[in-house]
Amino acid sequence: DLFDESAWRTLTESDYRISTASDRTGYKLEGPALGNSLGMLPSEAGCPGAIQIPGDGLPIALMADAPTVGGYPKIAVVSEADLPILAQRRPGEKIRFQLITIEQSQRALKRRASDIHTISQLASRSSRD
């Protein structure tokens, strides 16, 4: 594993503030550093939601315009269901990460899709009335 138990504990038990240096590429987070002694790694695939840890140890959550490859170690990925919620956060706002399983993430994504479908049907009925 690239990160020890201390890094995981820090990530999930700390508040992080979205930096003013954030944009659609990534949300730079201010808070406790996670300690990246690895520096750069060979380039590997990245995706929106990946949380990479550059040399300073401060997490960056990759967002919609994130590069498709990069060389920083990645500690986690924001659930696809939660990524739109994170995208609505503004610089200066606090966030906190919570570890969930892949199954929990999949259930949340299905709930979101169902909610969107329900809203779409209600809006469609409303426009016909």
Q: Where do the PLM segments sit?
A:
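Conserved "landmark" site that anchors the functional core of diverse proteins
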Residues: 1-129
